[in-house]
Amino acid sequence: MNVFEVVTAPIILPWPLQNSLEIAARLLLHAGDQSSIDFLRPAGERALVSADSVSWRVFKNPLSLFVGGVTAVIMELAEPHVRAGVWEHTTFRSDPLRRLRRTGLAAMVTVYGARSVAEPMIARVRRMHDMVAGTTLSGEPYRANEPELLNWVYATAAYGFVQAYHTYVQPLSSLERNSYYAEGVPAAVLYGATTAPRSETDLELLLKGTANRLERSDIVFEFIAIMRSGPILPLFLRPVQDLLVRAAIDLTPRWLRTILALNGYRLHAWEREVVRHIGALADRLVLGSNPAVQACRRLRLPSDYLYVNRSAPSSISTGHVNFPVEPRAHDR
């Protein structure tokens, strides 16, 4: 039986294991000055995205959030201006865990936070971007708040998260994936993106328009090495950390893996099934510390609101979405 054909139902584990996972979930989102964000308040206040959205289903899963986030960064780092901004103005090298926590928390606030909490946070992020500028190794100037760069960063994140869920957790129909992209547009505009994809077709066009600027870089390999061997995940999850990072690489569009020289990191078929089983299990695990669960409580919805009646028809493809974007001539 395919893992996606199993009827899903929310689960709560025995207390010691459940408690360990609750602590791990809290630590993964402990981001220093932003860690005081309360997803339970203000009571009754809606988020930027509705509770019945595809986005709320996708972002509740910690495995696809981690895998998709790594995929997004790999794709971001392929663009030289974004790469310079990320590598020179963030703590990925010196403190990758803190950087990942801040990024993950920002994503959670954007999707699940009350509007009165999310909008000021996004405004702070934009002010920070206003101060980020420099030159690439080739001497080209960049500013982090350039719409073209923000469009790329947003698109890679949107692709990474939804594709990780679709591939490793539960297949989404084309309609659901298109809905997911459309749901994110209002938040993308707040972040400063001007042409955020509203559908997979829009994403394909954006990838085509950016492909000739993407290039191989040793920084991508440095980032992957940090993610594979650094103390990123809680101790009890370290045995699968390398597997999950390679799953993220495997999720990167095939043509881009070729440009970045990453084809050697691909998963074996049995490894892909292992990730899918872990992802399916994570999608049933109701953690009180998960912002998705807390946001449901804020809206007076059941804690397991996002965890019931989510089985997918087995006829939906579980494979990669490989957009027909051609590599540059010298990469063929």
Locate each region found by the language model.
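Mature, function-bearing regions of proteins
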Residues: 1-152, 156-332
